[in-house]
């Protein structure tokens, strides 16, 4: 939309102040900070909110540490996470050769917030998120010495130069436990080059680590899938069921320090027990090389776009009909994630531009028969519990249901980002007014939304849903901004933009 000259809009979120005091103890990491926030707020606690980190503790955190914390704000369901652009940020940009781009951005002295949560960094201990949710958090100490079969260090959450150097310090001169497979994926070409230059990469290799390509890899099941029934300790941000590529595996989320210590011992280990000095001096100048960046052509509109057979057209949506009818194609429990809705693993990632192919796998982790039934029925409705669409902002989790002609999702509650994506694609997100009505629906019930176009156009927030099979009606809530009303009426954002040109 922005590329076509339009605007990016969202509902104004509330702001939660995460006030940090104290300083992290040795062996306690930024990952433990965000795991503590998840423990407090849960995976639903950030919906409709911006997380703003303030307080004297913020000054003790480097930019990579702040990035780790902000990265997992998505697991809270938050709109975004904010740290101040202060002198720490300026020093980081200077080291990257970009100080000229620095702009100071600090909270006003009299800033007020919708809520405040205080966390004393000095009181934190190493934490671990147990399977299969990032908010299933315990201390490493109380969890005990769980035997580890695999340790994976990296991902967009924990793969910075700072993270990698601490891992290298722990591994240097030691050997990975014989029962553990250790894989390390540095987070960028820059980080990998610096590790190779200073010898840290060799320390990892000599300890027994396998070095993986810088990529969206093991976190999403692209390689390193654990063996059957394995325990895998990982530094990524999500441990949803089956996401690793092995449904029977247990994925535990930990810091880099905990992961490296556990790789040596063979069991979940508190890194504070190590004698290693984990101090890392951030370089005054990072190794940066832009020689592989391909600059856009001056006449960009004249560039030829080559589409192979795996690049299929964008699914087309119809304008909202006067009345919608269809079967309840699937009934789901709470916390259905975007991984459930549209799995994304080594088998499916090559088809990200091929929605018809991806449709064959939509919601198959819940019910393998769903895609075939949805196509045979010509579309219909989905019934869901709380927090439907939890997880990332994966647009395919809305694009593929659009292709399957899903007309609406009736749920107890929605994850914010996914709800917005449904609206963007013309799919109605309806919330049960009385959660008990969820129990009255079953698969194959015939559903009708009478006069739905008239209701949406009139800004009506209470939408009656008729169950024609069982002969009852219940009330659902449909809260849309005027702009979102236009999107739903047009059949999605793209249709709306086209109609305005």
PLM feature spans:
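Fe-S-dependent hydro-lyases/dehydratases of central metabolism
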Residues: 1-501
């Amino acid at each position: 939309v922005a590329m076509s000259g339009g605007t990016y809009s969202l509902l104004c979120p509330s702001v939660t102040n995460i006030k940090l005091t104290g300083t992290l103890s040795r062996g306690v990491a930024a990952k433990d900070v965000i795991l503590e926030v998840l423990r407090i707020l849960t995976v639903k606690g950030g919906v409709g909110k911006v997380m703003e980190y303030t307080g004297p503790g913020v000054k003790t955190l480097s930019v990579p540490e702040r990035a780790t914390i902000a990265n997992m704000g998505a697991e809270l369901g938050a709109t975004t996470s904010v740290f101040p652009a202060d002198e720490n940020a300026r020093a980081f940009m200077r080291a990257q050769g970009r100080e000229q781009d620095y702009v100071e951005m600090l909270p006003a002295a009299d800033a007020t917030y919708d809520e405040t949560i205080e966390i004393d960094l000095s009181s934190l201990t190493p934490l671990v998120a147990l399977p299969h949710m990032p908010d299933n958090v315990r201390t490493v100490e109380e969890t005990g010495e769980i035997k580890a079969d695999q340790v994976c260090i990296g991902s967009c959450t924990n793969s910075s130069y700072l993270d990698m150097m601490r891992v290298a310090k722990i591994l240097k001169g030691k050997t990975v436990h014989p029962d553990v497979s250790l894989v390390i994926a540095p987070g960028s070409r820059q980080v990998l080059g610096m590790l190779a230059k200073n010898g840290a990469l060799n320390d990892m290799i000599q300890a027994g680590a396998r070095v993986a390509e810088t990529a969206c890899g093991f976190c999403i099941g692209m390689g390193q899938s654990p063996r059957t029934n394995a325990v895998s300790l990982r530094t990524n941000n999500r441990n949803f069921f089956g996401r690793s590529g092995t449904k029977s595996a247990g994925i535990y989320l930990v810091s880099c320090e905990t992961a490296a210590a556990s790789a040596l011992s063979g069991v979940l280990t508190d890194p504070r027990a190590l004698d290693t000095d984990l101090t890392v001096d951030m370089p005054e100048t990072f190794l940066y090389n832009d020689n592989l960046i391909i600059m856009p052509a001056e006449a960009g509109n004249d560039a030829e776009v080559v589409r192979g057979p795996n690049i299929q057209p964008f699914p087309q949506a119809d304008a909202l009909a006067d009345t919608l009818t269809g079967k309840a194609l699937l009934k789901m429990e709470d916390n259905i994630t975007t991984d459930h809705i549209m799995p994304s693993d080594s088998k499916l990632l090559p088809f990200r531009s091929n929605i018809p192919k991806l449709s064959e796998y939509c919601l198959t982790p819940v019910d393998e028969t769903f895609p075939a039934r949805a196509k045979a029925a010509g579309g219909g409705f989905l019934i869901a519990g709380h927090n439907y669409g939890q997880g990332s902002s994966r647009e395919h989790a809305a694009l593929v249901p659009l292709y399957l002609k899903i007309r609406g999702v009736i749920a107890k509650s929605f994850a914010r980002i996914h709800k917005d994506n449904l609206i963007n694609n013309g799919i109605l997100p309806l919330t049960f007014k009385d959660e008990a009505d969820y129990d009255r629906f079953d698969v194959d019930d015939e559903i009708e939304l009478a006069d739905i176009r008239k209701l949406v156009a009139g800004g009506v927030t209470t939408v009656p849903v008729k169950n024609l099979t069982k002969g009852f009606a219940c009330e659902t809530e449909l809260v849309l901004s005027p702009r979102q009303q236009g999107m739903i009426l047009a059949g999605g954002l793209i249709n709306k933009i086209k109609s305005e040109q």
